Amino acid sequence: APWVNYLGSPAYGAIISNNAGGYSFERSGANGRILRYVFNQFDQPGRYIYLRDDESGDFWSASWQPVAKDLNDYQVKCCHGMGYTRMEASYAGISSKAVYYVPQGKAYEVWALTVTNDSDRDRSLTLTGYAEFTNHSNYEQDQVNLQYTLFITRTYFKGNYIHQMQNEIYNPNSGRFLGLAGAKVDAYCGDRDSFVGTYRSYSNPKGIEEGLKGDLNYNTNSVGALESDIVLQPGETKELTYVLGGQKTEAEITEIISRYEKSGAVEAELAQLKNYWHSKLDNLQVNTPDKNFNNMVNTWNAYNCFITFIWSRAASFQYCGLRNGFGYRDTVQDIQGIIHLAPEMAKKQIVFMLSAQVTNGAGLPLVKYDHKAGQENHPDENDENSVYAKQTGHPSYRADDALWLFPTVYKYISESGDSAFLDEEILYANDGEKGTVYDQIGRAHV
């Protein structure tokens, strides 16, 4: 199985493997897909950056996949960090470093590429960033309903980015984009068939062998591919930044890309990310004779608990991301994993989940991302026209959902000392009634 890292926040999620495979989504792994990913043994497609030597025609990638050069000639190191992943590669006298991350508080991702000429002669290189967009933001629709999804997209080239639109007449802000800062776009492609070619794959795409031809998609499969031609003298380094995102206006896209024309922008954002995660994880550090145990407890187990807390297990390489909301039981359980590290975050999420408890004491099996306390439908409307069942696919409650409030609230108060929390009033999910935290827990066992 791929070695995976999780990047982002509740607003924007990205999953990336040690070979740059993976996918991205806005808010919902089910209904907010941006990058296409096929759940198979090949870990493809992903966030690909191709490098081509224009003199020899030889090409490779900034991660081992997708080109998969012979490892006797190609060296690569992948480092998964907290909120970022870094690939360092060396081949044919050229070294590269690609850093992938989602800036703190932003709803897009950055691929920061550094290329250095380690040889003793000038090198002419073509660098190409590649992203394969979903045709539909719903994962199942994109993979299955081809009679529809192959006829709703179109790509445009806007100077330094590819813009994909979906049903643009009815939804002019539905697009996704792949943009470039730090270099001129010398060629582009927005059509998958034109980029990959017939009977080819990501390892030998026609668009890399022959160069991009400016083909755009109109009702087939959309991609974003941006090509830049550079010349590096011996020892010279070039920095480029690709930016990927969705649901942005043209003005917003232009402003976002322009941020990365400024020197030091990437370094500042990475420092901010690292400081954020250290501020959380440093709240508990264990020290035993076993360094591997310390590293697991202090860093990776804690980091994974935070990601699970943020995404509520909604997306991974095992779980395809089909749940469009927070599972009640899972989310209340997951809060327990970060109480000792971030009690303020835990409290906020406990309040949110209490507001998804109905007046009969049960929890809504699926809590929508746009949940509105006091205004929600619920499974008690269990006739054939149940609005809640149609919206969520859950026609009934689960017996143990709300019971998980007992240990979670108890652990929060034990850790924080905030016993006054029991007296705070919170709206129930289904009408205007309020109850104290203590009262709501009391109803949970009924």
Predicted features, each with a name:
Residues Y50, F326, T331, I335-H445:
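Aromatic-rich carbohydrate-recognition surfaces in CAZymes
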